[in-house]
């Protein structure tokens, strides 16, 4: 789905399909869609991976170049180990600090992170199963904005009152955010399981001494 198709979907849900008398412009709906895409990205970001060089003797990495970064899930260093050697890390602004493992020696590391989803004229990175969810959030924002504008005006046209639009929009946003919270919890559990630090069981046959 591209942006034009998403706008059409949102218009359909809003019953705003009379091209001679649109209640919302394409620009307005695009703004609401982008807001919904941003919120989806916070709960369920686009999985991404980057290869960055470390600096010998330093545990700090500049991650400002990670495009549209929403979060960092894991840091693998050194790369190529089996199982993967994930390290503990901390982030302050655009600076990531590797907190565990051997001192970096200038070799590469892998950064697994979540990025903002893309929805533009060319296409989308949003999974098909979440397109209706994004449309629902955009509808909620559009309805609330229109209701806030029209609620104190008399002749706004249409058969639905501004108050009804406000209630409908608030319910759409409530359902949208509730589903985002559910998806966010599930995604955190998945990330925790996928990128857990490798801690092999202690040997029962080797004596490590007192």
How should each PLM-predicted stretch be described?
Residues 1-210:
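Glycine-enriched, solvent-exposed interface loops adjoining structured elements
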